[in-house]
């Protein structure tokens, strides 16, 4: 059929995707619906999957960057976050795969949207969906999701995660609870590009190129991924253990007294303009941008 499907479970939605040739869409969709309705348990495959997940977790603990990323997640979200909303080792090992298969069988019974990107006419797509998409007469509401909150930082706090390595990772996180404001986005983008973005940014040039105090350094104000989330300000340094104090002092100085550079400013401005001129939302990304 020259088609394939995939499943994407996320922190706030799960979706299945079917792609292929236009002329094979009816047959592909019929087979796809059959798989969803009649998926069978394979205990050996589940055992291998659980083993792979646990192996990846064990390997991640041996990676300094992975450990540091989890510390950042804790600083931003607190003890309950999307990163911690996973099955424990015991839950994975004791899980009955039939429970997972039952969830697959029920996926069409919940409220859902259908997105189509392709050459077929709208009415033809609707006819195929009506013929092959198996849904009950009454759809069920999607179960309420777990709500996670990004934690404000009203006072200074230090979080330490011991890791035996020859360099340290340092980050400062600030959340004042400020919600998304489209009016400040141009200034925010310019600040990130000029001050903390890439290799031409002030932070990188000062910390690595001019002072030799860091392997990598950056700072940026993160735009909320959803309207319910606030802006989060983050800094980052990777440096040798014996340069930690000097690097942190220099970083504070640069942040509180931002150096001015006409050359760096123009480079940042040109980079933003080039990005705006060349970036396009195309194809199926138009649909996803609308949903998001």
Where are these regions (language model features)?
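His/Glu-based metal-binding/catalytic segments typifying zinc-dependent metallopeptidases
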Residues: 141-202
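Short Gly/charged-rich anion-binding patches and loops
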Residues: 99, 202-203
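Charge-rich, well-structured scaffold segments of protease-associated domains
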Residues: 1-142, 211, 216-292
């Amino acid at each position: 059929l020259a088609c394939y499907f995939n499943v994407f479970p996320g922190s706030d939605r799960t979706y299945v995707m079917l792609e292929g040739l236009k002329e094979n869409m009816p047959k592909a969709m019929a087979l796809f619906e059959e798989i969803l309705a009649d998926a069978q348990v394979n205990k050996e495959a589940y055992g291998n999957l659980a083993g792979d997940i646990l192996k990846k977790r064990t390997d991640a603990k041996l990676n300094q960057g992975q450990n540091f990323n989890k510390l950042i997640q804790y600083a931003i979200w607190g003890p309950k976050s999307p990163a911690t909303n996973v099955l424990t080792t015991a839950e994975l090992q004791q899980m009955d795969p039939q429970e997972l298969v039952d969830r697959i069988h029920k996926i069409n019974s919940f409220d859902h949207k259908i997105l189509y990107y392709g050459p077929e006419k709208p009415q033809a797509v609707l006819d195929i969906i009506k013929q092959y998409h198996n849904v009950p007469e009454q759809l069920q509401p999607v179960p309420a999701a777990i709500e996670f909150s990004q934690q404000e930082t009203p006072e200074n706090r230090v979080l330490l995660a011991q890791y035996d390595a020859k360099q340290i990772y340092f980050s400062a996180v600030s959340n004042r609870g400020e919600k998304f404001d489209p009016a400040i986005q141009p200034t925010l983008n310019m600040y990130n590009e000029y001050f903390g973005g890439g290799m031409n940014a002030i932070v990188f040039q000062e910390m690595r190129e001019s002072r030799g105090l860091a392997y990598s350094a950056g700072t940026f104000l993160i735009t909320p991924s959803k309207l319910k989330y606030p802006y989060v300000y983050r800094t980052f340094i990777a440096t040798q253990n014996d340069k930690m104090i000097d690097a942190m002092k220099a970083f504070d100085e640069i942040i509180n007294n931002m150096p001015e550079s006409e050359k760096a400013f123009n480079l940042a401005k040109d980079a933003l303009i080039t990005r705006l001129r060349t970036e396009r939302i195309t194809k199926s990304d138009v649909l996803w941008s609308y949903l998001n």
